[in-house]
């Protein structure tokens, strides 16, 4: 056994009956960001051997579905699926097991490491994108997402992709991550159900004035707050920060 496997968290996991030391990463992330709550329906991607599943079940007490390429030894109260998270058929299997929408999608999926930084980073980004795709399809509006990513030059683009879908996004390395590890966890809270996304451009007519004196344009029934705009004005706007119930936009051009 490698020496570094016998660290503090490794021994603690053995003592406390967790299948993997990574259990403590999920505990620490959840202590800080409170993504899994009592009753949450949780999907865990790349879940073998099952440390995160044990913690997710303790925290939620509700439906927990675990997916991995490898077989996961049965755990009480947890549905396990052997499948590839990059495949559509696996998503369908997870949806059937859930029988509804998920409150939280978590992914600790990691490729087999080749030792070549760029290759491992690219494979990790592929898995993180697959996890985001699944989260977008299975989460209820307002649901939360947690995903592991190996750092590298595609990380910032990936972070932007997550930011487009969630109202608040953080990147965090828990104390239980090994010092030498390139991993970082991205936490997305409050999946957006808005019909607009940050950076999009629209031509709109300002409908009304909000309480703060800014103009309000409606896009597919969704309120977009436009600074320095007056009712009746026809504008080309660029969407800025998007929240659950409204978005902000700036004026590009008066039409
Ligand atoms: C670090 S381990 C997960 C540890 C787990 N969170 C725990 O606490 O026990 C990463 C897992 O991702 C899985 N994995 C990698 N690629 C996958 C894929 N395409 N589909 C499903 N699982 C995958 C691996 O088989 C591996 O079990």
Curated annotation (Swiss-Prot):
It holds the Pfam family FtsJ. S-adenosyl-L-methionine binds at residues 50, 52, 68, 84, 108. Transmembrane segments: none annotated. InterPro entries: NA-bd_OB-fold (IPR012340), RNA_methyltr_RlmE (IPR050082), RNA_MeTrfase_FtsJ_dom (IPR002877), rRNA-MeTfrase_E (IPR015507), SAM-dependent_MTases_sf (IPR029063), TRAM_dom (IPR002792). GO terms for molecular function: rRNA (uridine-2'-O-)-methyltransferase activity. It catalyses: uridine(2552) in 23S rRNA + S-adenosyl-L-methionine = 2'-O-methyluridine(2552) in 23S rRNA + S-adenosyl-L-homocysteine + H(+). It is found in: Cytoplasm. Keywords: Cytoplasm, Methyltransferase, rRNA processing, S-adenosyl-L-methionine, Transferase. The keyword tRNA-binding does not apply. Residues 195-253 form the TRAM domain. Belongs to the class I-like SAM-binding methyltransferase superfamily. RNA methyltransferase RlmE family. Specifically methylates the uridine in position 2552 of 23S rRNA at the 2'-O position of the ribose in the fully assembled 50S ribosomal subunit. This is Ribosomal RNA large subunit methyltransferase E. The gene is rlmE.
């Amino acid at each position: 056994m490698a020496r570094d496997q016998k660290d503090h968290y490794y021994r603690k996991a053995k003592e406390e009956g967790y299948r993997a030391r990574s259990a403590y990463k999920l505990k620490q992330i959840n202590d800080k960001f409170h993504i899994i709550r009592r009753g949450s329906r949780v999907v865990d991607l790349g879940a073998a051997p099952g440390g995160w599943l044990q913690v997710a079940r303790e925290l939620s007490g509700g439906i927990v579905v675990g997916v991995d390429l490898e077989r996961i030894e049965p755990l009480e109260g947890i549905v396990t699926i052997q499948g590839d998270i990059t495949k559509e058929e696996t998503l369908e299997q997870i949806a059937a097991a859930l029988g509804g929408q998920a409150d939280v999608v978590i992914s600790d999926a990691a490729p087999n490491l080749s030792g070549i930084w760029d290759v491992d980073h690219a494979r990790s980004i592929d898995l993180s994108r697959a996890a985001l795709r699944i989260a977008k399809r299975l989460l209820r509006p307002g649901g939360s997402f947690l995903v592991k990513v190996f750092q590298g030059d595609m990380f910032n683009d990936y972070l932007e992709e997550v930011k487009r879908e969630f109202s608040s996004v953080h990147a965090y390395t828990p104390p239980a991550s090994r010092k030498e590890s390139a991993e970082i966890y991205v936490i997305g809270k409050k999946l957006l159900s808005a019909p607009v996304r940050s950076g999009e451009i629209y031509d709109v007519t300002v409908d009304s004035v909000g309480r703060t004196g800014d103009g309000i344009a409606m896009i597919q029934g969704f309120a977009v707050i436009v600074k320095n705009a007056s009712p009746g004005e026809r504008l080309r706007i660029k969407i800025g920060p998007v929240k659950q119930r409204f978005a902000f936009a700036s004026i590009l051009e008066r039409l």
